[in-house]
Design a protein with these regions (language model features):
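Betabetaalpha-Me/HNH-type nuclease active-site subdomain
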Residues: 1-32, 356-482, 486, 496-500, ...
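Short, charged/polar micro-motifs that form catalytic or ligand-binding hotspots
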Residues: 31-43, 152-157, 169, 173, ...
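Short helix-capping/linker segments at secondary-structure and domain boundaries
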Residues: 56-60, 174-176, 304-313, 401-411
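A cross-family structural signal marking well-folded subdomains
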Residues: 151, 179-402
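C-terminal, well-folded lobe of enzymatic/effector domains
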Residues: 310-333, 337, 469-514
Length: 514
């Protein structure tokens, strides 16, 4: 748009806030080294765009060759050693490799949010330069526009102590800055405000802790929110009745971070909670159980108890899994159900150091109203497909484990790894095809099975007798069992569906009972 307005028009990009560090001499020139406090994204994008332009210049044309050298000297200094801009979160060297070598990876390969932002910016800038040229405009025109008609306002600060205060003020402008980032700036600022401490050592340690926090979070932005809320909820003075919100969590953690020890402990505790949350949510096997926030909170609290060894923790989490699946999976209660009980118990697990037996008894008590008899009845002759896909996948996985144990076979996870990687609908198979089955039998538990991804769409409307061999070839015991049912009876009908359903419900009544 600035280009179309004519050569007399400019565009104000942003105010950039920088911390002045030291001077650095390059040959006979002296430069100031500046740390960007605010405006990093715009500057990074601008530099990536300049490099994308540089990569399009050729050396045969004298004019382009001159511009190529100028851009190269601007972006990379001192014999390829010093970059014009260096980023804090470039452990994978995506940014530096693009500036030095002109190479880049697809953004889908990114493992962290910071890496994804860099790689997407590279893709966007390269695509923009290509479009600019395809529209008949020249690269020198684009470079001239960037050099002469885009403007920044530079605000310099000369004290690192002021960095975090400035950052917090800037974050109150209504910009979309995560509450976790705000907490970081608050804690770092509080550390600088303290008197008579080793600021350099403390700040370095805090930087390392926060680096680890962001590394664990990776691409899962929701994990930063959950870790923050859980850390504050579990740190509350009294047992809360529900998880704290993000803003309340920042306020709560800020209030206790008043000394160097408490600041360090707050950051370290947040890291441990982040790691525990990651372990709970990363287990795709139980994602039908962990879809409820307070259930995840309790599992996180149990995982954080360092004095409970694995031989004790495993049965506790098994109890938690049984009760939670009965309440939220089999009986389909929503997140309002027993929220206070879960949250208070999670707080007590950590703050009152409840014994293992007491934790187990408390989990049993939470589930006492939600009996296995009610849960099984809820699945009998019910629609176990629409709205229950995730729970069905978990149910079938657990049933597969049971069949392997029953037949004294080693459980094979190979096919299940593929099943977990796709949405449940890509693996759920109606033995009696949806288009042919009577309405009352169509979505019943006994008519459903899981197959390797996409196989269900290949089989589609085939007669169950014609599907049996394909089921057996999958290697899945649950599919093989269906093939056995078909072979043993007169095909697949209401009687077969009811018989298989009752067999699975008999097993479920034992598996998820207290």
């Amino acid at each position: 748009k600035t280009h179309e307005k004519g050569s007399d028009e400019g565009h104000f990009m942003a105010a950039v806030v920088c911390l002045r560090r030291t001077k650095q001499r390059i040959n006979t020139d002296e430069f100031d080294v500046m740390e960007v406090v605010d405006g990093q994204q715009r500057l990074t994008t601008l530099i990536i765009l300049l490099n994308a332009i540089k990569l399009k210049f050729g050396e045969k044309d004298k004019g382009e060759a001159k511009l190529l050298r100028e851009l190269g000297e601007l972006l990379v200094k001192e014999g390829d050693e010093l970059l014009l801009l260096q980023t804090n979160h470039d452990a994978t060297h995506y940014f530096s490799d693009f500036l030095r070598k002109g190479t880049s990876q697809p953004s889908k390969k990114a493992k962290t949010l910071a890496d994804r932002e860099i790689l997407e910016a590279v893709e966007d800038c390269k695509a923009f330069v290509t479009r600019w040229m395809s529209d008949g405009k020249t690269l020198p025109d684009l470079l001239s526009l960037l050099k002469n008609r885009l403007f920044f306002l530079l605000h310099e600060i000369d004290s690192e102590k002021a960095v975090y205060t400035v950052f917090e003020v800037l974050n109150n402008r209504g910009l979309d800055v995560s509450w976790l980032d705000r907490l970081k700036s608050i804690l770092m600022g509080a550390a600088f405000e303290l008197k008579n401490i080793n600021h350099a050592g403390t700040i370095t340690e805090l930087h390392n802790i926060w680096r680890d926090v962001y590394s664990v979070i990776g691409l899962r932005q929701g994990l930063s929110t959950e870790a923050l809320r859980f850390a504050a909820t579990l740190r509350a003075v009294e047992a809360p009745s529900r998880p704290l919100g993000e803003e309340a969590s920042v306020d709560a953690l800020r209030s206790v971070a008043t000394t160097v020890k408490s600041i360090r402990d707050t950051a370290s505790r947040l890291l441990r909670v982040t790691e525990a949350c990651d372990a709970v949510t990363a287990n795709v096997r139980i994602n039908s159980v962990t879809r409820i926030s307070q259930a995840r909170l309790l599992a996180t609290a149990i995982s954080l108890r360092g004095d409970i060894d694995e031989t004790q923790r495993k049965p506790l989490l098994a109890r938690w899994e049984k009760v939670s699946f009965r309440i939220y999976g089999m009986l389909l209660n929503d997140a309002r159900t027993r929220v206070g009980d879960y949250v208070r118990l999670a707080w007590q697990v950590l703050n009152e150091k409840l014994p293992v037996k007491s934790i187990d008894a408390a989990i049993r008590e939470i589930g006492s109203e939600f009996t296995i008899e009610r849960a099984v009845d809820a699945l009998r002759n019910a629609n176990c497909y629409e709205g229950w896909e995730t729970e069905l996948r978990y149910f079938m996985f657990r049933y597969e484990e049971h069949l392997a144990k029953q037949q004294k076979l080693n459980f094979s996870n190979e096919q299940w790894e593929k099943i977990w990687m796709v949405s449940p609908s890509e693996s759920i198979e109606h033995v009696w095809a949806k288009s042919r089955a009577p309405v009352k039998q169509r979505h019943r538990l006994g008519n459903l099975v899981l197959l390797p991804p996409k196989l269900n769409s290949k089989l589609q409307d085939d007669d169950p007798k014609d599907k049996a061999e394909a089921y057996r070839k999958t290697g899945l015991l649950i599919a093989g069992e269906v093939a056995d049912f078909i072979k043993a009876g007169n095909g697949w009908n209401k009687t077969a569906i009811e018989s298989r359903e009752e067999a699975m419900l008999d097993w479920a009544a034992r598996e998820w009972a207290d």
